[in-house]
Curated annotation (Swiss-Prot):
Organism field: Aspergillus giganteus
Entry GO MF terms: lyase activity; RNA binding; RNA endonuclease activity; rRNA endonuclease activity
Known catalytic reactions: a 28S rRNA containing guanosine-adenosine pair + H2O = an [RNA fragment]-3'-adenosine-3'-phosphate + a 5'-a hydroxy-guanosine-3'-[RNA fragment]
Primary gene name: sar
Family annotation (Pfam families): Ribonuclease
Function, in words: Alpha-sarcin is specific for purines in both single- and double-stranded RNA. Its toxic action on eukaryotic cells is the result of cleavage of a single phosphodiester bond in the 60S subunit of ribosomes. Inhibits both the EFl (elongation factor 1)-dependent binding of aminoacyl-tRNA and the GTP-dependent binding of EF2 (elongation factor 2) to ribosomes.
Protein name: Ribonuclease alpha-sarcin
């Protein structure tokens, strides 16, 4: 009886000691955007919290063509982030800081947007459900919604998600994550 108890104890100890931890799964980063939308029942604006999955937004940017406004919908197109066409920041403008060097440097954007040394930001619609925006839709083009995934030209580095503060118009703000 003692031998059986010892055998069970040794077996349990061996299983515990030899157990290999399983790798942790990386959690998807969720971005939260605040957007004022009109309530059709009250006809008043209400602030909505819109949630975006970073993996889905990055996937949207990878499915987008690497062009500046040359599609039926004009997306993706150059996100100036407050800069002028020469990469200068006009007085009184403050660019959004994404926290990545590729995303925060002043742009270099040639006339056609395809120069060998060009580097700039592109914006492309992204949605809470992660579906791909139909970039070649013409009239009527798909509603782009309030949020945009921002990424770099030419290497498609993910910068972040921004959204209009009121429906699909007005100021663009960096969403939180």
């Amino acid at each position: 009886m003692v031998a059986i108890k010892n055998l069970v104890l040794v077996a349990l100890t061996a299983v515990t000691a030899l157990a290999v931890p399983s790798p942790l799964e990386a959690r998807a980063v969720t971005w939260t955007c605040l957007n004022d939308q009109k309530n059709p029942k009250t006809n008043k604006y209400e602030t909505k919290r819109l949630l975006y999955n970073q993996n889905k937004a990055e996937s949207n940017s990878h499915h987008a063509p690497l062009s500046d406004g040359k599609t039926g919908s004009s997306y993706p197109h150059w996100f100036t982030n407050g800069y002028d066409g020469d990469g200068k920041l006009p007085k009184g403008r403050t660019p959004i800081k994404f926290g990545k060097s590729d995303c925060d440097r002043p742009p270099k954007h040639s006339k056609d947007g395809n120069g060998k040394t060009d580097h700039y930001l592109l914006e492309f619609p992204t949605f809470p459900d992660g579906h791909d925006y139909k970039f070649d839709s013409k009239k009527p083009k798909e509603n782009p919604g309030p949020a945009r995934v921002i990424y770099t030209y030419p290497n498609k580095v993910f910068c972040g998600i921004i959204a209009h503060t009121k429906e699909n118009q007005g100021e663009l703000k960096l969403c939180s994550h």
